[in-house]
Amino acid sequence: MSVEIFTKEQQARGSFNNGEILEYKPIGFPQDGGFLKPYSNLFYWAHAWTPGEKSTIGLHPHQGFEICSFVLKGKINHFDTKQNKWIPLSEGDVQVIRSGNGISHAEEIDAESEIFQIWFDPNLSVSLKEDATYNDYKSDDFTINDFSGGTIKTILGVDSPMKIKTENILINCYSLDGGTHSINLKNGMVHSFFILSGEINFNHNIYDLGTFFKINDLEKFKFNIDKEMKLFEIISPKNPSYKTYANMR
């Protein structure tokens, strides 16, 4: 059994444009100094927001990785050298940049907006030989199902339109009512959870917004909450079938 918990204070930090964009990074770059390093086929995970006015990160290149942006609040605008135009995205929307053999993009985060940017490793020995592609998906494209105690939004999984090449990835977002909860965990997989709002009582400790959980070799994730909360989940293989970039270093 393995449950690792990383509060905001244990995560790497970042910023752009003199603090116009701020970040906590559950999984940072090697030079960022956070406690958690890349694992599974997850290479990077940043929670970024604008505390005030909108701000733009200028054109910059990417290769190999699949870069997914999830709009948690507000709006963003995206530009890349394949689309050659600005594309707006709103709360609940998702974009996928399969950066392949190279693409450059710019991103504008609107005032008081918030995103995840997560890099997946699709097997760089293959992806670096492929052309870059782009897709975005609207919030209404994703299925929301009710269950006892809340709802689950399937972002990547059965019946989801979202597609990535990185193997065996599932992504969900839970909206949970107050009470006791138990989430079934998959054998051979790593479940990564991020508290989007509210608090969790786990093993007699309280964890709040921004806390990150990495869990594997456990049948169920059991916890209590006093009131409504939101929980973001990525399920990924404990041992990918290929050597990841992080394992090559």
Sequence positions of predicted segments:
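Short acidic-glycine-tyrosine-enriched beta hairpin
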Residues: D80-R98, K186, N201-I225
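Ligand-binding loop in jelly-roll beta-barrel domains
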Residues: S99-V126, I206-D208, I215-A246
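"Short basic amphipathic alpha-helical interaction patches in structured regions
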Residues: K82-S90, I109-D110, E130-D136
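Conserved short histidine dyad/triad with adjacent acidic residue
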Residues: E4-G34, L42-H62, L72-F79, W86-I87, ...
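Conserved, well-structured core segments that form or line functional sites
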Residues: I103, E112-N205, L209-T211
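Glycine- and charge-enriched low-complexity intrinsically disordered segments
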Residues: K129-T133, T244-R249
